[in-house]
């Protein structure tokens, strides 16, 4: 049912956005995967990567950390088909940093509170989106001192 899906999706986004000490809400969109399971595996590998999350917290457009997380997902990809966008800004195309890449432009985008990462695997038609938050020093302080 679409209504139930909408409510559950809204709740999932709120849970991700509500992380104590977080400063950014992140959508990781994996598109054009060979199958749903590969799309999901890559999306969660990126969304759960401490290196990706800390780079985003530091407003560092470190696309290499995203590529690392894709590789760590252990799914078959074709590097020459890989594309990565930060919001509407294309950073990687055909597995290579685009020639017109301007780090200043991407770093400016990273200052926002909502970050959309899109990873196009270019080998199918299945998509998956994962939601997460950044990993800040404040998050670590809160959770390091937390005791139940």
Give the predicted meaning of each segment.
Residues 1-57:
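A glycine- and small/hydrophobic-rich beta-loop-beta segment
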Residues 32, 41-44, 48-148:
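Internal helix-turn-beta structural module
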């Amino acid at each position: 049912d679409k209504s139930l899906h909408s409510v559950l999706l809204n709740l999932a986004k709120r849970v991700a956005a509500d992380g104590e000490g977080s400063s950014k809400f992140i959508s990781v969109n994996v598109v054009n995967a060979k199958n749903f399971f590969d799309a999901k595996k890559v999306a969660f590998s990126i969304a759960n990567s401490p290196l990706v999350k800390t780079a985003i917290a530091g407003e560092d457009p470190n696309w290499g950390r995203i590529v690392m997380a894709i590789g760590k997902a252990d799914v078959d990809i074709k590097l020459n088909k890989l594309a990565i966008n930060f919001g509407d800004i294309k950073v990687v195309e055909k597995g290579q940093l685009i020639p017109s890449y301007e780090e200043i432009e991407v770093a400016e985008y990273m200052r926002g509170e909502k970050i959309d990462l899109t990873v196009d695997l270019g080998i199918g038609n299945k998509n998956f989106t994962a939601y997460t938050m950044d990993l800040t020093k404040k998050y670590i302080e809160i959770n390091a001192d937390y005791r139940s």
